[in-house]
Amino acid sequence: MVGFPEYVGVVKDYLLVIEDKADLAKHIKLDDKGNISAETAAITDYAVNGAVFYGKHLAENTSYKKVIVFGVSGDEKKHKITPVYIDETEFHRELLEVESFISFNEDNIDEYYIREILKENTD
């Protein structure tokens, strides 16, 4: 049906998936209920939709319990990075946009997970 994500990597026990589109207009497509569309055309043409599709597939077919996917669109100067968390049940939740991937390196990813995904205070 569709190809492969641009990037798949592992940081600690997190599986990270990046789907990239050059055009900001191809960042995300929502359905009429405001959810991330799972239509084939949306998966192939939009960054976030493709990332969620790949992430769900990997959550289902690997042993990873924590999958964070990123829909990335635009270029270096003007871009959007939308992370979406997917757990082993394939539940997914769109997270706040980020400016870069610094929160997802080995030193920061656990704190990001606790603060942004579990919604617990890390102070």
For each predicted feature, which ranges?
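Domain-level recognition of nuclease-like catalytic cores that cleave nucleotide substrates
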Residues: 56-120
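A short, conserved, highly charged catalytic patch centered on acidic carboxylates
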Residues: 1-68, 72-84
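Charged, often low-complexity linker/regulatory segments
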Residues: 1-3, 14-16, 28-29, 105-123
